[in-house]
Amino acid sequence: MAASKPVEAAMAAAAAPASGNGVGSSGGTAAPGSGAGTLPRWHVALAIGAPLLLGAGAMYLWSRRRRRREAGGRGDASGLKRNSERKTPEGRASPALGSGPDGSGDSLEMSSLDRAQAAKNKGNKYFKAGKYEQAIQCYTEAISLCPTEKNADLSTFYQNRAAAFEQLQKWKEVAQDCTKAVELNPKYVKALFRRAKAHEKLDNKKECLEDVTAVCILEGFQNEQSMLLADKVLKLLGKENAKEKYKNREPLMPSPQFIKSYFSSFTDDIISQPMLKGEKSDEDKDKEGEALEVKENSGYLKAKQYMEEENYDKIISECSKEIDAQGKYMAEALLLRATFYLLIGSANAAKPDLDKVISLKEANVKLRANALIKRGTMCMQQQQPMLSTQDFNMAAEIDPMNSDVYHHRGQLKILLDLVEEAVADFDACIRLRPKFALAQAQKCFALYRQAYTANNSSQVQAAMKGFEEVIKKFPRCAEGYALYAQALTDQQQFGKADEMYDKCIDLEPDNATTYVHKGLLQLQWKQDLDKGLELISKAIEIDNKCDFAYETMGTIEVQRGNMEKAIDMFNKAINLAKSEMEMAHLYSLCDAAHAQTEVAKKYGLKPPTL
């Protein structure tokens, strides 16, 4: 399957960071056949029946049944409030000193609790008047007067004092008082949320995450403020963890299927073309099966030979020999080495090689254009769309007849939500390469998503008809079937979508992502968890480097309540991530699962099962 991921990334971008593998395949975020393939993450969530909250891939997965149970039947003592956060302190007014309970004015000796309530009421008046220091004094008096067995009242006094400290931006005191309140009333949502905000200000991200996770669950995921804070801290934690991990990661060569799919998205790429006659000798392989000798002592030609034999681990070293010797094929070797640096997720190593190829005015223009495409894609992965656009435009300027420029720029335009411009680029690619099935399939998908988003039924039907024409004209294009399957799934035509995925598997039996998509379809279509997991497990069996399979398996295990297994799956995906951005997203999933595990233990919340 060639390049489904970049097409869907535009639609998924609003829901989650792209699941890219850091390789500039046919566009914006990942190599084809990698990452999340054609299915946006909100589709993954729908397929497994899980709420996908917020926009950064920070998934809190909790069953709807559990949410309803948690939201209902809980008394005021829990502190649960469905509305947005109150800005005023809590507590009803107590009888004033010298007033009897019947309002007669009879002077009665007040109990300790009554005096504490009176002090709190006075503090509330100071709070509303913006006199926070005086309010704190009153709340402190209330705490000292309140009987120690009155947990609910004491927790309110501590929470109110924390609110006053919050107005003074005394975050340490806020956290301390909220902790006291929560110790007295463990499910006190207001105190938990206020402490979460204090932890955020104190840069205690993990503590903030745990508190806000508890709030989200206890509120039944109904309060936007708490969900936004959860999303924010998960993003920060994910980026922080990924930055450290990515620096020290071991480069990892993707599967042969991944690499073949990647190169299949290029048609004007000199370095991926078969070796020409005369570039290698006519000698047979020796009895030990060693590579054929090349006529010239060229590291680049040896690298090309290894590439044809799928002996990918030796390519970078052979290219380096050509470059060090300043050989005849130095420009080609630089580009091939850069490409494999990208494939193993070493963008920092790739960039100098790409820069040098681009600057070689005497080099073949197609080499320079290809380097610009790959550097432009890399910039997009690094969230630098202006630099990316500049590189693609320069590529079009120096090599206007290069179909790859328009194909890959079309992917960029989709990521930038410029669908009409994307379609124009796909059309330009098709004019130059009428038999390039991938561009035709992706054009159909872009038109379909545009019509689907606009709820234009006639254009949706036209796009669906376009898919039929593409698969009829190009029956060997697995990507056509895969993209059509996603459109069919959107249209609730699950049976036909399943047939399309079967076609993909027939054409590319080693493409693990297709099995993941088919597995997700079983969940969405038939709620057949066993079949879905069987297919995703098959994907891992086929390609144990398929990060998308591990990520999806982890997501499902969270929904099943198997947090330990989910965390294990997310960690495996993290180790396979080929971009820092993708790794950050995966860390956010893993951190969310960790937080839910801790909250479930602390508050006695049993993880749900599907």
UniProtKB/Swiss-Prot annotation:
GO cellular component terms, A-Z: mitochondrial membrane; mitochondrial outer membrane; mitochondrion
Membrane-spanning segments: 42-62
Modified residues (N-acetylalanine): A2
GO molecular function: mitochondrion targeting sequence binding; molecular adaptor activity
Family: Belongs to the Tom70 family.
Organism: Rattus norvegicus
Name of the gene encoding the protein in the UniProt record: Tomm70
Topology within the bilayer: Single-pass membrane protein
Cytoplasmic side: 63-610
Subcellular location: Mitochondrion outer membrane
Function: Acts as a receptor of the preprotein translocase complex of the outer mitochondrial membrane (TOM complex). Recognizes and mediates the translocation of mitochondrial preproteins from the cytosol into the mitochondria in a chaperone dependent manner. Mediates TBK1 and IRF3 activation induced by MAVS in response to Sendai virus infection and promotes host antiviral responses during virus infection.
UniProt xrefs under SMART domains: TPR
Assembly mode: Forms part of the preprotein translocase complex of the outer mitochondrial membrane (TOM complex) which consists of at least 7 different proteins (TOMM5, TOMM6, TOMM7, TOMM20, TOMM22, TOMM40 and TOMM70). Interacts with CAPN8. Interacts with TRADD, TRAF6 and STING. Interacts with MAVS. Interacts with HSPA8 and HSP90AA1; both interactions are required for preprotein mitochondrial import. The interaction with HSP90AA1 is direct and mediates the association of TOMM70 with IRF3 and TBK1.
Cross-link (Glycyl lysine isopeptide (Lys-Gly) (interchain with G-Cter in SUMO2)): K277
Compositionally biased residues, Low complexity: 93-108
Protein name: Mitochondrial import receptor subunit TOM70
Residue numbers spanned by region Disordered: 69-109
BP GO terms, sorted: activation of innate immune response; cellular response to virus; negative regulation of cell growth involved in cardiac muscle cell development; positive regulation of defense response to virus by host; positive regulation of interferon-beta production; positive regulation of protein targeting to mitochondrion; protein import into mitochondrial matrix; protein insertion into mitochondrial inner membrane
Modified residues (Omega-N-methylarginine): R74
